[in-house]
Curated annotation (Swiss-Prot):
Cystine connections: none
Domain of life: Bacteria
Protein name: Methionyl-tRNA formyltransferase
Species name: Idiomarina loihiensis (strain ATCC BAA-735 / DSM 15497 / L2-TR)
Single GO cellular component term: cytosol
GO molecular function annotation: methionyl-tRNA formyltransferase activity
Keywords: Protein biosynthesis, Transferase
Enzyme Commission number(s) from the entry: 2.1.2.9
InterPro entries: Fmt, Formyl_trans_C, Formyl_trans_C_sf, Formyl_transf_N, Formyl_transf_N_sf, Formyl_transferase-like_C_sf, GART_AS, Met-tRNA-FMT_C
Catalytic activities: L-methionyl-tRNA(fMet) + (6R)-10-formyltetrahydrofolate = N-formyl-L-methionyl-tRNA(fMet) + (6S)-5,6,7,8-tetrahydrofolate + H(+)
HAMAP family reported in the protein's UniProt record: Formyl_trans (MF_00182)
Record-linked CDD domains: FMT_core_Met-tRNA-FMT_N, Met_tRNA_FMT_C
Transferase keyword on record: yes
Entry similarity comment: Belongs to the Fmt family.
Length: 316
């Protein structure tokens, strides 16, 4: 079966590697154009491009797939199926129609829950107890196609987006190759999604990481895990230099207790953690990153930054 692969980040490269390991016939690889990265802002190839070139696979990097010329180039590859994993470009219907067996997408959620750009983060943010990957037959709509197969995994109480990402990174490739071995069979039993049960995982922004201390401690703690490694949950202190007053929270936990102090007020600082009042409950910060520094445990922070983390002071 002639496979065209489309993907960009490391998550996608893991799936391409699985196809190559199992000797599938990959006839072409699509990935986003090289983007400036690093301090020098030099154009850098994607993880998928690097892997494809290592295996002497033809690489295509169109800015979009809307032009007739780019669509003709894809058609010339005569694909039986196109596998799409975190590609980052929308595929017009004309592209979806080119492979004889259509286009398959590996999506990091249990569809129809968390269609969209940030399914891993939103699952933790919302307090979901499980996640997984779906192999979906692509349609013109955003993650709306029928589901051919799903694999589930539990979301642990201390799960971060980084750790859940790695779980799905191992589930996805196995699920994909399982489907490809009996594609006709899986397609014949594909299950339509229920639009009524759909939720949308909107893209994260840096501003969303700003902690609102009037929110419940349980919600803030989920945000700390959901937004790690990006955009990170963060707050500010008026006791740090203006313009360099952002504190990134890497880890936190819920503790029992209550206080009549206002949200954002620090009520206790020990080597175990920095206890902050929220709109409902107490949040203990156990690891944070000061401006220009690496992440540090609370035991280091309370000694080195008593001007920021002493009881009675506030975080904004």
């Amino acid at each position: 079966m002639r496979i065209v692969f489309a993907g960009t980040p490391d998550f996608a490269a893991q799936h391409l590697q699985q196809l190559l390991d199992e000797s599938h016939q990959v006839v072409g690889v699509y990935t986003q154009p090289d983007r400036p990265a690093g301090r020098g802002k030099k154009p850098q190839p994607s993880a998928v491009k690097k892997l494809a070139l290592e295996h002497q696979l033809p690489v295509y990097q169109p800015e979009s797939l809307k032009s007739e010329e780019d669509q003709a180039a894809l058609a010339d590859l005569k694909p039986d199926v196109m596998v799409v994993v975190a590609y980052g470009l929308l595929l017009p219907q004309a592209v979806l129609d080119i492979p004889t067996k259509g286009c398959l997408n590996v999506h990091g959620s249990l569809l129809p829950r968390w269609r969209g750009a940030a399914p891993i983060q939103r699952a933790i943010w919302a307090g979901d107890l499980e996640s997984g990957v779906c192999i979906m037959q692509m349609e013109a709509g955003l993650d709306t196609g029928p589901v051919l197969h799903e694999e589930r995994c539990a979301i642990s109480p201390d799960e971060t987006s980084a750790s859940l990402y790695h779980k799905l990174e191992s589930l996805g490739p196995e699920a994909l190759t399982k489907v490809l071995k009996d594609l006709d069979g899986y397609q014949s039993q594909a299950k339509p999604q229920s639009d009524a049960n759909a939720t949308y995982a909107k893209k994260l922004t840096k501003q969303e990481g700003k902690i609102d201390w009037t929110q419940p401690a349980a919600f803030i703690e989920r945000c700390v895990r959901a937004f790690n490694p990006w955009p990170m949950s963060w707050c500010q202190s008026e006791h740090l230099k203006a313009g360099q007053n952002t504190v990134k929270i890497h880890a936190a936990e819920l503790i029992q207790g209550a206080s009549n102090k206002g949200p954002g007020t620090i009520i206790n600082s020990t080597h175990e953690g920095i206890d902050v009042v929220t709109g409902d409950g107490i949040l203990r910060i156990t690891q944070a990153q000061m401006p220009g520094k690496k992440a540090q445990p609370a035991s280091t922070l309370v000694n080195g930054y008593s001007n920021v983390f002493s009881p009675g002071l506030e975080l904004q």
